[in-house]
Amino acid sequence: AEQLAIAPNQITVVTVDTASSPIGIGAYGSRNMVNAGNSVHLAAGEVRDKAIRVAAHVFGVEEKAIEIADGLARVKDDPAKTLTFGDIAKALGAAKGLSIPKDMPIGFEATVNFKPPDVTYCNASHVVEVEVDPETGGVEIVRYVVVNDSGVLINPTLVEGQLQGGIAHGIGNALYEWMGYDENSQPVITNFAEYLLPTSTAVPNIEIIHVETPSTLNPLGVKGAGEAGVIPVAGVVISAVENALEPFGVWIGEAPITPVRIIELIEASSAAR
């Protein structure tokens, strides 16, 4: 949209049929915007250059005299001279009555495959405040703050959603999602009635502060947004629980830390004193 100076709602994203498309390995690994986003950005830039070249040829001016604005290619000093992208597509499709530079291939399209020279993971710091009831072992997350740097934010709302979902998952890792096995190494938790997950009441309002440090490894300056949402959570939540239980001399080296386990650790620590 930015390269072609058009509104996002003028762009149609066609879902690929995996039965006929080239091999793809998924949109995971914090690389979707980095790889696909930059590929689209560069391809749109090539389409933009084609539009400028065709318009310059049609109007008999230099390419630097053409601008792309409002979804049109037009002469800067004479805005009445315009070509729509439809006009340009017709010209590049060899339509009658329209001409293009002799050495220019037909087709108003571009194919670009961008591969970054290195990984572009995001950076983040998580801070959490918890309250622990030493009698019941219950843990309440009072406040959760994240400072996150995913580079240039193309869609801040999507990044925040990614962070919120990751934090909810991480809270499950820290406090709920226990996988137990019997003496024969068989899982004793085999359904979602027994495998606890955090609900909306267990996930606090998450305060997100964005820091945008553009990546130097790609044209858009973007970074991933996946890992920093979930990876720090269990560590910071359990560390906060341990800090709250400092008067009891409790040390925690496991996850998840359930209410039953908290009571056991408090009792064990008290007995050892």
Spell out what each predicted region is.
Residues A1-R273:
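C-terminal catalytic domains of large/alpha subunits in multi-subunit enzymes
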